[in-house]
Amino acid sequence: MNVTTSFPILNLFGPKGSGKSELAHSLTSFFIPSYIAPNINNTTKAALAEAVAEVSNAIVHIDEYKNTLDIEKREFLKGLWDGAGRSRMNMDNDKKRETTAVDCGVILSGQEMPTADIALFSRLVFLTFSKTTFSDDEKRRYNELKLIEKRGLTHLTGELLKHRNQFRSNYRHMYDETAADFSVAFVGKIIEDRTFRNWVSITAAF
C-alpha cells in the first residue's frame, strides 16, 4: 500500500460446493486460525468495517456476495481497494469525520461475479470455480488439508516474515519495472487503469 495506494480485492466466485469458501479459509488460516467469514448480506456495514480494521498485514474474507447487494455496501467494498474503510462522525471528538484504515488484503466470495457495479468490478482480480463433483482421492486430500490447517499454519507465516525486509527493499523497483514491461506488452490495447494497476501490484511481487 505504501507503493501503490491501492490493493486489489481477490474475488472467488462459482456455484455452491465448488470450494471457493474453502480456499478463502485456507488462505486466512495463515494468519487467523478458525476464521469465520462474515456474510455480507446480513452483517452491518459497521461490523464489516470492524472486521477489516481489527487486523493488519493479514487477510480478511467476506462471504456471500450477490449483485443485489445494497449500494452502501458496494461503496464500502470499493473503498477497501483504496485503503479506506468506514467513514463516520466522531461525536466525542469535536464531531470530526473519521475513516477506518484498511491494512489487510481482502477476499470477496460468492456465487455471482460482481457485475452490478463496473467500478467495483475493476477493483477485483478473479478466480472462477466451476467444478462441484470430486473424486474419492480429491476428497481424501481435502480432508488431509483441513487437518493440517486445524493444527495451525501461522508458523509458516513466521517463516515468510524472514523475507519481509528484502521484499520491502525491492518492491518499489519491481513495481516500476513490471509496469514498464506491461506497458510495452500491451501497447495499442485499451486496459482500464485500475485493472492495469491490479495486475502490476500482484506480478511485481514475483
Task: Please provide the spans of the model-predicted regions.
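Phosphate-handling catalytic cores of nucleic-acid transaction enzymes
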Residues: 1-206
